[in-house]
């Protein structure tokens, strides 16, 4: 939509790259709006049960990824988006629950395997895209960590752990992840204070201490930060870059008695 974004993604990407930065894009391609060219042309591409009113999430329906033609559509469209935008980073998100477990392309006796076929279709799409764009850093996400599993990690080297970025909550979340996954796949960010989910106020140093035990990022409005906070972030990033190989790939030990009562987290 060049009315909203003059020059389109290509123009925006060009400006970002000219600043010496890399360009990332956040996509959520598994849904379809009923007020769209795709739905008007192919209403059968949506996951609905014939004769019933479909469940909608944010006025959207799911695309039926059990169908090969839908998979091909997503591969083609995302290839165009990534090519035009010259993306360096892609966050692949999925923010609604499954509903209306039914495919108009499956016979009645196979409707029970709909969810399994859907995930196999998703794997085909992201396998094709990650092979076409080996230089793009892909990060998986599904309302946080709802797809944090070994299947997605076959195609994407890191996954967003949770939409809850509160430092105390994240300490427990990331500790739990550490029993099954290495730190190098764990997306962890320093976010605003007070925290958006819990309204808890936590010092920047403490937020960094937890977020650096994974793949570090910052999701703050830089214009809201003081000169002192920006200087502190610069030092944190410098420290992380110096030690990130150990933080991501070193041997990880947990302190005994972690969060026994939730009052003295380590």
Regions found by a protein language model. Name each.
Residues 1-40, 72-76, 117-127:
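Aromatic- and glycine-enriched glycan-recognition loops and surfaces
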Residues 19-23, 86-88, 133-136:
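Short, well-ordered coil/turn segments that N-cap beta-strands
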Residues 23-27, 90-92, 139-140, 218:
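Hydrophobic faces of well-ordered beta-strands that scaffold small-molecule active sites
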Residues 33-72, 116-224:
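Glycan-recognition surfaces
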Residues 219-266:
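Glycan-recognition and catalytic regions of carbohydrate-active enzymes
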Residues 1-6, 44-50, 104-118:
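Glycine-rich tight-turn/loop motif centered on a GG-T
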Residues 27-33, 92-99, 142-147:
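Short, solvent-exposed turn/loop segments enriched in Gly/Ser/Thr/Pro and often Arg
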Residues 63-93, 129:
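An active-site-proximal structural segment forming one wall of the substrate-binding cleft
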